[in-house]
Amino acid sequence: MTYNPFSLSGKTVLITGAASGIGRATAIECCRMGAEVIITDINPDGLEETFRQLPEQNGTHIRIVADLTKEEEIESLADRLPRLDGCVNNAGIMKLVLTPFLTTEIIERIQKINLIAPMMLTRNLIKKKKMKNPSSIVFTASAGGVFRVSAGNGIYATTKCGIDAFMRTTALELGGK
C-alpha cells in the first residue's frame, strides 16, 4: 500500500452548491481522492448532472436538493446526514450591483446564501454532532472579497469577508476540540 497524504479513502464529505462550478469540481475531486460524497444544491438538474459525473468506485454517493436560504431546510438536511469527515460550504451567488442600485432585497438574497447559510449549516452540524473528531469544515471565500475590490462588488465582497471572519472564529472555537 502506498502512502498518500491526500487520500480521502473511507471519508464522507458534504459539498454544498454542487450543481455547477467549484462545487461540482470539488465533488468530483473528492471522489477521485476516495471519498463518498453527499452533494446538495437548490438546482435539481445541475445536481443530477454532477451526480452522473461522480466516479462510482468509492461506494454510495447521495444527492439532496435543498434551499439553504431556508433555515428549516438546513435543519432537515443536517438531520438526514450521517456523521461527516468533512463539509465544504461552497453554495454562493455573485451579482454585481453598483451601490446606487442596491436594494434590501438584493442585499438579503446574497447575504442569505453566501453568509447566513454556511453559518447556520455549520451550527447545525456542530449542535447535532454530525462532524466526526477529527474532521474538517471548509468555506469558499474569495480573493475578490478579502483582498481586492471592484465596482459593483460591494455586497458580494462584504459576504465573503464575513465568511472569512466566521471561518477564523469557528476555527478558534473548535480547533482545540
Task: Locate each region found by the language model.
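Conserved NAD(P)H cofactor-binding loop of Rossmann-fold oxidoreductase domains
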Residues: 91-96
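A short, exposed helix-loop element centered on a Lys and neighboring polar residues
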Residues: 122-123, 168
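Flexible N-terminal pre-Rossmann segment of NAD(P)-dependent oxidoreductases
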Residues: 1-11
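Catalytic loop of short-chain dehydrogenase/reductase
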Residues: 138-162, 167-168, 172-175
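Active-site loop of short-chain dehydrogenase/reductase
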Residues: 11, 83-84, 128-143, 176-177
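Substrate-binding pocket helix/loop in short-chain dehydrogenase/reductase
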Residues: 98-111
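Conserved glycine-rich cofactor-binding loop
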Residues: 19-20
